[in-house]
Regions:
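Partner-binding and oligomerization surfaces adjacent to conserved cores of proteins
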Residues: 1-278
């Protein structure tokens, strides 16, 4: 085994160095050609917490306000949120505490490697062309540096983190609905949905998505004028391996970069393993 191959198959109490990005074969080819990943916008995500338009949900207030002005500015703020916010989504490995490790079921779970970010069968089905695409393995600390390099006067980098999965939505609703929250009086609501106390909700999803075990990078780019305006990040040398799906056609030759290792995932009685190709 290579050092990387060994690390990718370590027990679940070990390495937190890698992030995993599932993609189709056609998208993988574009990624390798450009050495970059395309950031997603909010409108094309699957979770309603991301793609919903908060300005259409109304607001609560007290005192005398100019409703026409507030409605206009909240709509403008909602459009800014859709235009400016970009993200990249990865899977990460699951880990057990030393106490959890004593559980016999957890030890069996570790033996079959289903805790690994590259071994999520539903992700292979949904995002990697039903097991015929690829899973890209990035070194986390190197990709963090690449992502932070996007920062400039227009681009605000939000701290990358694991997604918080919860069905408790009262805090989100209050934050986005109460225009007088925080015992403050503001007169310009045109950036209301991008204020500091609301940014943490860009890292929140409903519990129905918890099996994705997502790790998200997010930024606000105020130079963008449309949700469809493309933005990319050059990942430098952070791509360390490409894992091909079990249904990846043997007649195809995926041209991966020379310094990137290549594996194929194999499923035996539902247990995943890696076969070194390059």
């Amino acid at each position: 085994m290579t050092n990387l191959e060994d690390r990718l198959q370590q027990p679940m109490t070990g390495d937190d160095s890698f992030l995993y990005h599932y993609t189709s074969l056609s998208s993988a080819c574009k990624i390798f050609e450009s050495n970059s990943l395309k950031l997603s916008n909010l409108t094309n995500t699957n979770d309603p917490l991301d793609f919903f338009s908060p300005e259409n949900c109304g607001f609560s207030s007290c005192g005398d306000i100019d409703y026409k002005k507030v409605f206009y500015e909240l709509r403008l703020s909602g459009q800014k949120r859709r235009n400016y916010v970009r993200m990249l989504c990865f899977c990460k490995d699951l880990f057990c505490t030393s106490e959890e490790w004593k559980n016999e079921k957890n030890q069996d779970f570790a033996d079959n490697l289903l805790f690994k970010g590259w071994a999520r069968s539903r992700m292979w089905a949904q995002y990697a062309d039903n097991h015929s695409g690829a899973c890209l393995v990035f070194y986390k600390s190197e990709f963090q540096k690449a992502f932070k390099s996007l920062s400039n006067d227009d681009v605000e980098i939000l701290s990358d983190r694991a997604i918080n999965y919860t069905n408790y939505l009262a805090e989100l609703e209050t934050s986005l609905e109460d225009i007088n929250s925080g015992a403050r009086v503001i007169y310009d609501y045109s950036s209301f949905y991008l204020e500091e106390d609301k940014k943490k909700f860009l890292f929140q999803k409903c519990q129905d998505y918890r099996d994705e075990n997502e790790y998200r990078f997010c930024l606000i780019n105020r130079a963008l004028n449309s949700p469809d305006e493309a933005m990319f990040v050059n990942y430098g040398t952070s791509l360390k391996a490409v894992i091909l799906g079990q249904r990846f056609s043997t007649s195809l030759n995926l041209a991966t970069p020379d310094n990137v290792e290549q594996f194929k995932i194999m499923w035996t009685f539902g247990r995943p393993s890696l076969l070194k190709i390059k």
